[in-house]
Amino acid sequence: MVALSAAGAWAQEAKSPGCANLDPRACLVLALDAMGGRARLESLKSIAYTSAGHTALVEQSYRQEPFITAYERLMVKVDFAGNRVYRESRLTWPEADPGTSEVVTTFVFGPQGGVRKNASADGPCSLSDLDWARDTLSLGPARLLLTALQAPDLHYESPEVLRATSHAVLAFTTGRKQVRVLLNQFNHLPDAFETVEQFHDHWWQWGDVHRRVYLDNFQDFHGLVYPTNEVEERNGILWQSRQVLSLDQNVAIDETRFRMDPKVAEKSAQGKGWDRPFQADKSQELAPGVTLFEGAWNATLIDQGDGVLVLEAPISGTYIQGVFDEAKRRYSSLPIKAALLTSDSWPHVGGVRQAVARGVPVYILDLNQPLLDRLVKSPHKLHPDLLEQSPKAPRWQIVSEKLSVGTGKNRVELYPLRGASTERQYMVYFPDAKLLYASDTLALNDDGSLYDPELMREVAEAVKREGLLVNTVFAMHQGPMPWTNVMALVQKAGS
């Protein structure tokens, strides 16, 4: 009998480490007590904190891990009573030109939505801004356990080992989001929480992303035991880390800081985010049969007589399907021969899953295949796209050296750049038109100077190396420019 009793106790402990013989709600109460108690957390009507952090720029086209990093200082006020958030951000952007790396923004969120504060007027915020604010109010360290307490479906899931320690796992639903909280079996503090969701930031293209946020460096702030460090992991990548530098509780609320234009806030909430439609109204012919469609991310149709090439598949499946539809409208008798994806930046390849689902061959750089293989295989069950509904294998055409595509006046030649900053991009050359597509290397600042001149310097080296004659150049974020003008800007930047 003693042996059976011990076995039963062991089974209970194995199911919910640190919470043996407790139901999920009682286990949660232990966690609340560890953070200072339910009453202490519920007494928080507002907090203000400053933090320093960094984010790995996993979505950029420079190099894969170890990734280049952006750094950010935040000053945040959270009004729990009014469901409002005020955030001042000072971001250091590593890809900026010298002297222009710091970006300062102010974001305000309330029940009606959110805005970015500008000097003259409020501007729309992004859907990812709204997600961040809602997470701050419901899943931030001061509210995570209280949100779990309100969930009618709170339950145990299988325990997990974190940092060599078994953790009880409590799971619940908030809104449409499934949340799992990992409670330390010894001190009952929440060491991490997890979600699976489709984000509205640069991770949107990956569909169902597994997020784990590690909570660490707990400190006692007048009875509130608060984790001052958060490390966010997405799909196994340590993506972001934030360290709280100061924390004040029940601070006074300055109503003037939370004022916002309600019409702009409503517009923000109605934004499409990355799932935006293609607009064909802004187009220009760069050469007979070569049509550029300019937008935040450009796309180009190339008529080769026996079919149409689509140059770039950016943003989303919705966007690139619009490009395919425009190709069909303009060239109804011609098939889409292939899509040319010249880089691996996530916004630049956001439509690749749609191209694969449509059975379109896709020309990709050799270095980019591992990332694109993962992107094509990534689950999209929460918001199924065409590839999730009808899986297909990609028809990759690998670019590892000069490669000619098509014949006739609009044949193109693909050349890997192989520069230090451009090694994950290839350029597209139109020999007859002496026209060059320079991937994501050419963009102008507001004063007409080159953004990150090193990129175009590496393009110039590749053009010289391959012996190309170029009259006109265009790129992902730049319309056509005379080659001589761009070379003059490169020379000026280096002088």
Label the model's feature ranges.
Residues 241-305:
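Zn-dependent metallo-beta-lactamase
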Residues 318-363, 465-470:
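Active-site metal-binding motif and surrounding structural segment of the metallo-beta-lactamase
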Residues 231, 460-495:
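Divalent-metal (often Zn2+) His-rich catalytic cores of metallo-beta-lactamase-fold enzymes
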Residues 44-50, 81-88, 163-171, 190-192, ...:
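Short, hydrophobic/aromatic-rich segments at coil-to-beta transitions
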Residues 284-327, 425-444:
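Conserved beta-strand hairpin/beta-sheet module of binuclear metal-dependent hydrolase folds
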Residues 20, 26-33, 37-121, 153-161, ...:
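N-terminal mature ectodomain segment of secretory-pathway/periplasmic proteins
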Residues 19-26, 33, 108-179, 185-187, ...:
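Flexible, processing/modification-adjacent segments and terminal tails
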Residues 163-262, 429-431, 438-439, 444-466:
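Gly/Pro-enriched, hydrophobic low-complexity segments
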